[in-house]
């Protein structure tokens, strides 16, 4: 055989052809008209070294953010991940996206997910968290569905300052099922204006900090919610500095966990965070890992409350998670464990400081803040009319500039959303400022 990685010998092929009653490969494909046949036009075969070299050439056509100054956030953030995180998380013992149904052979994964749930509860100030959702947007949509089950109502009010793509996913999930989605506006501070809440509202959904980077006043939101449930979309790193949503009476907390050790890969690797109050646990979607004791008296971990799930009760399931993002949750658990409370707080503090330094320097150049509300590590500022073209030009200069917002918020006119994190250096900022002149 010319190709040792193909397992079939000439004798194997001959035996299979004899079994189906044809004399050759050509006869096997004779039913395909000649007019429909064409050459595969494949390049000449290469050895392993040649293949590796060619793949390296192709990969070098890609753009790597490692050599870019990055000021683009909007839900996905460039952060530093200690090498030990992936050294541990990529061990073959852990490397699967599948649910650990068989507890007796999955104790390591189950314990890691239990620790992840515990740390999410500590960050959010909630009582129970699940072992992952697909991403922040679908977690918000599932939170709205959960609020409908809990209240028997069919309307959700979502702040227009929530990520526009999250709101789009929310509508995709809800409107074709007959549920109502109403958007609440925002004021000059960038915070939500709640005028649409009534007795028919199942839940209010706000983002904290919101898409504009502004820190919402959750006391105000809670005071205007009436009997509606409060859903808060969070950026988890910010909670190392900000008061957790649970302290303000949040009923459900969701968010995107990419900041917790996951890379900025195109289209994913995402992680949906989902936490709630214990009294609502039976209506919560997603896997739940619990701690117990086995027959020998040893600590053991297992999936719990599985009667909520589709593999037990398909018709009445509150959870329809199949192949899931448990491995992403495991990475987040390792990252949070490695960083610890002090390390995560330092990441948040540096992100806050870098963003405020960037804003001050831009203001010195005449770029004014659009909103007056306090912000975390992102902010909206006014830009010239030709900024979208300049944005593309900056990308060619290895600067991933602040996001133009006119396509998302036409009413804001010529504005952009800038982001800084703990990896944003003063040299990066000077490079951006020079490009903005």
Swiss-Prot record:
| Subunit note | The glycine cleavage system is composed of four proteins: P, T, L and H. In this organism, the P 'protein' is a heterodimer of two subunits.
Q: Which CDD domains match?
A: GDC-P
Enzyme Commission identifier(s): 1.4.4.2
State the family it belongs to. Answer: Belongs to the GcvP family. N-terminal subunit subfamily.
Entry's SUPFAM superfamilies? PLP-dependent transferases
Q: Which reaction does it catalyse?
A: N(6)-[(R)-lipoyl]-L-lysyl-[glycine-cleavage complex H protein] + glycine + H(+) = N(6)-[(R)-S(8)-aminomethyldihydrolipoyl]-L-lysyl-[glycine-cleavage complex H protein] + CO2
Query: What species was this sequence derived from?
Result: Thermotoga sp. (strain RQ2)
Tell me the Pfam families matching this sequence: GDC-P
Please explain the role this protein plays, according to its UniProt record. Answer: The glycine cleavage system catalyzes the degradation of glycine. The P protein binds the alpha-amino group of glycine through its pyridoxal phosphate cofactor; CO(2) is released and the remaining methylamine moiety is then transferred to the lipoamide cofactor of the H protein.
Q: Which domain of life is it from?
A: Bacteria
Say yes or no: keyword Oxidoreductase present.
yes
**GO biological processes:** glycine decarboxylation via glycine cleavage system; nucleoside metabolic process
Task: Name the Gene Ontology molecular function terms of this record.
Answer: glycine dehydrogenase (decarboxylating) activity
**Stored InterPro entries:** GcvPA, GDC-P_N, GDC_P, PyrdxlP-dep_Trfase, PyrdxlP-dep_Trfase_major, PyrdxlP-dep_Trfase_small
Query: By what name is this protein known?
Result: Probable glycine dehydrogenase (decarboxylating) subunit 1
Please provide the record's keywords in A-Z order: Oxidoreductase
Class of enzymatic activity (EC top level): oxidoreductase
């Amino acid at each position: 055989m010319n190709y040792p990685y193909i397992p079939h010998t000439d004798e194997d092929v001959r035996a299979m052809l004899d079994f189906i009653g044809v004399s050759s490969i050509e006869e096997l494909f004779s039913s395909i008209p000649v007019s429909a046949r064409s050459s595969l036009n494949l390049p000449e075969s290469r050895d392993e070294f040649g293949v590796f070299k060619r793949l390296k050439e192709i990969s070098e056509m890609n753009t790597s953010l490692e050599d870019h100054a990055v000021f683009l956030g909007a839900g996905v953030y460039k952060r530093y991940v200690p090498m030990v995180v992936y050294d541990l998380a990529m061990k073959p013992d852990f490397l699967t996206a599948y649910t650990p149904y068989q507890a007796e052979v999955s104790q390591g994964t189950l314990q890691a997910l239990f620790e992840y749930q515990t740390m999410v509860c500590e960050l959010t100030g909630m009582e129970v968290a699940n072992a992952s959702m697909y991403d922040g947007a679908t977690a918000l949509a599932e939170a709205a569905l959960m609020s409908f089950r809990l209240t028997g109502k069919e309307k959700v009010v979502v702040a227009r300052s929530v990520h526009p793509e999250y709101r789009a996913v929310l509508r995709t999930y809800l409107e074709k099922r007959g549920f109502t989605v109403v958007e609440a506006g925002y004021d000059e501070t960038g915070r939500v204006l709640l005028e649409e809440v009534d007795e028919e509202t199942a839940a209010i959904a706000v983002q904290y900090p919101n898409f504009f980077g502004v820190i919402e006043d959750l006391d105000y939101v809670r005071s205007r919610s009436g009997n509606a449930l409060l859903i808060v979309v969070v950026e988890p790193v910010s909670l190392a500095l900000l008061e957790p949503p649970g302290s303000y009476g949040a009923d459900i907390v969701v968010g995107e966990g990419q900041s917790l050790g996951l890379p900025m890969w195109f289209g994913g690797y995402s992680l949906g965070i989902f936490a709630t109050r214990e009294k609502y646990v039976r209506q919560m979607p997603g896997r739940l890992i619990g701690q117990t004791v086995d027959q020998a008296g040893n600590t053991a971990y297992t999936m719990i409350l599985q009667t909520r799930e589709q593999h037990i009760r398909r018709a009445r399931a509150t959870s329809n998670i199949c192949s899931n993002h448990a491995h992403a949750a495991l990475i987040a658990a390792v990252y949070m464990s490695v960083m610890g409370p002090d390390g995560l707080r330092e990441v948040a503090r540096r992100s806050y400081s870098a963003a405020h330094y960037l804003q001050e320097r831009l203001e010195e150049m005449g770029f004014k803040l659009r909103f007056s509300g306090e912000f975390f590590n992102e902010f909206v500022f006014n830009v010239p009319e030709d900024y979208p073209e300049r944005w593309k030009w900056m990308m060619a200069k290895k600067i991933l500039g602040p996001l133009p917002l006119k396509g998302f918020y036409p009413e804001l006119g010529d504005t952009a959303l800038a982001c800084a994190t703990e990896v944003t250096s003063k040299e990066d900022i000077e490079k951006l400022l020079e490009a903005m002149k």
